[in-house]
Amino acid sequence: MDAVRFDVAAHPGAQAYKLLAGLVVPRPIALVTTIDAQGVINAAPFSFFNVMGTEPPLAVLAPGDREDGTPKDTAANLLANGECVIHLCDEPMADWMVACARSLPPGVSEVDRERLATHPAERVRPPILVDCPVALECR
């Protein structure tokens, strides 16, 4: 069987995203909470994420930029303070994950807007989403 070859340089941006998103299926989707300097909680879904190792434990996610090239809130908050909580979600959380994917202005909290229940994390500032079955506190 011949391998399918894909030249990423010839298919940038949205074309590459569509192909890459379809290569690894099914793939987990994380809902990531971060917090900005003013204490506003951001929540955003990520399909480009996974755990990559155990020594040390390593989780990786790939936030994209806004259309104007500026970092989205998750990336900006991670660059500013280096902390997040990566939540693994189950099917009952699907509607909330879609709602959190909407583009909101910086400083507007998806957690507040969607009335997501939280409780404090033990090791990082961003909170844990109560309804998610798994929460990884990350630095």
Where are these regions (language model features)?
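Active-site-proximal mixed secondary-structure blocks
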Residues: M1-N42, N50-R139
